[in-house]
Amino acid sequence: MSKKLHIKTWGCQMNEYDSSKMADLLGEYQGYTLTEEAEEADILLLNTCSIREKAQEKVFHQLGRWKTLKDKNPDLIIGVGGCVASQEGKAIKDRAHCVDIIFGPQTLHRLPDMIEQVRRGEKAVIDVSFPEIEKFDRLPEPRAEGPTAFVSIMEGCSKYCSFCVVPYTRGEEVSRPSDDIILEIAQLAEQGVREVNLLGQNVNAYRGATHDGGICTFAELLRYVAAIDGIDRIRFTTSHPIEFTQDIIDVYEDTPELVSFLHLPVQSGSDRILTAMKRGHMAIEYKSIIRRLRKARPDIQISSDFIIGFPGETKEDFADTMKLIEDVAFDHSFSFIYSARPGTPAADLPDDVDMEEKKQRLAILQDRITQQAMRYSRHMMGTVQRILVEGPSVKNPMELRGRTENNRVVNFEGQPKHIGSFVDVEIVDVYTNSLRGKFIRGEDEMDLRRNLRPSDILAKHKQDDDLGVTQFKP
């Protein structure tokens, strides 16, 4: 009988990426196969997130449900990973005795060893250290699961915003070597991946070592990735305004593989609140970045994060946020009511904004951004959009679903052979969360591919010709 593994994941795309690597790791080295049913599993792993309110309580509620499974099967191994594990450490075991393994985001690569320790009789195996970027050196080769893939390029954050736990749970910023990232993406491209999403808590702070002892900036990395044959779209998540430098903006001007969509969190439009949040920039500086971006890429769509009801936020502060939303014309947002995270500087501030007021402000903000998004979607009516077909439509399996460059889902009638490739569709209808398309042409009528193997890019470097034009040559 095959050994079964069940992973429950909460939180950001980085956690989703980490969970996929856990599955690959335990599958390759220990022969575990994934199951959706916790009752079938020999190992249960909970990959946690500490961003939301009452994150710890949510973890213990889940562990309570899993305890009943362990009572029936004493050989069942239960592990807790992610940011709550990093934050709480041994306290998780003290409260939930059913837990065997506690590991942090930076130590998931040690899971096979931890499992063996438990099998040998150790009562609790805990490792929530920050061993630089070691975890990427011990993970198996990437495995594509469709035409899109996430690739982690760095870990941690060194900005220490007053409300955020990330520096304490994932550590300081550490970048992967650029050659390792390029190799991983080249391997994914050879498996049919067409779009990559570069992941990090603050990707534009990326400064990765090169094979010759130099440093690769984020802008340079974007150009290297764009040169890999088969990679026709590049996204990245998440970035910080204070390091969104001109060289990154320049990439938007000359690199069509970089999509016309950017998630750039601002959190608030009030300079007073931005200062209290320790964001390191003012609203006018954020707008300057957007202005320069739209000069380089006029059709780019912008999304953001917003925290509503941060300590001390007045009606005037909220009005400043709404003014920024109107000025920038945000297309989408992840907006949340503020709740204090234990151990952060903001947790010591009085939470003095009434909850009903917070809820009202959140509803107003979300309504405004929904209106702006619908306005732009209507402008897309009648246009031809190139979409990457990801699979069957969620609502109608007889149809196909894809995503536009500006991150809108499009459902259309098409043949299964188009899954994993690009098609052009005419937008014929607009809904709140999706668009309706009419098939125009398939990829065989486009000129997208180059006669290069993805591995060829590993030997390339940037070189300027006599006219100052940048090229990538062997």
Swiss-Prot record:
Named cofactor requirement(s): [4Fe-4S] cluster
Binding positions ([4Fe-4S] cluster 1): 12, 49, 83
Binding site for [4Fe-4S] cluster 2: 157, 161, 164
UniProt-annotated location(s): Cytoplasm
Reactions performed catalytically: N(6)-dimethylallyladenosine(37) in tRNA + (sulfur carrier)-SH + AH2 + 2 S-adenosyl-L-methionine = 2-methylsulfanyl-N(6)-dimethylallyladenosine(37) in tRNA + (sulfur carrier)-H + 5'-deoxyadenosine + L-methionine + A + S-adenosyl-L-homocysteine + 2 H(+)
One Pfam family recorded for the sequence: UPF0004
Residue stretches making up the TRAM domain: 378-441
Residue ranges annotated for the MTTase N-terminal domain, each copy included: 3-120
GO cellular component terms listed in the entry, alphabetical order: cytosol
Cofactor binding summary note: Binds 2 [4Fe-4S] clusters. One cluster is coordinated with 3 cysteines and an exchangeable S-adenosyl-L-methionine.
Keywords for the protein's UniProt record, in alphabetical order: 4Fe-4S, Cytoplasm, Iron, Iron-sulfur, Metal-binding, S-adenosyl-L-methionine, Transferase, tRNA processing
Gene Ontology molecular-function annotations: 4 iron, 4 sulfur cluster binding; metal ion binding; N6-isopentenyladenosine methylthiotransferase activity
Signal peptide limits: none
Residue stretches making up the Radical SAM core domain: 143-375
rRNA-binding is among the record's keywords: no
Keyword Iron-sulfur: yes
InterPro entries: Elp3/MiaA/NifB-like_rSAM, Methylthiotransferase, Methylthiotransferase_CS, Methylthiotransferase_N, Methylthiotransferase_N_sf, MiaB_methiolase, rSAM, rSAM_horseshoe
Family classification: Belongs to the methylthiotransferase family. MiaB subfamily.
Entries under NCBIfam families matching the protein: miaB-methiolase, MiaB/RimO family radical SAM methylthiotransferase
PANTHER family per record: CDK5 REGULATORY SUBUNIT-ASSOCIATED PROTEIN 1, MITOCHONDRIAL TRNA METHYLTHIOTRANSFERASE CDK5RAP1
Oligomeric form and interacting partners: Monomer.
Name of the protein in question: tRNA-2-methylthio-N(6)-dimethylallyladenosine synthase
Source species of the chain: Shewanella sp. (strain MR-7)
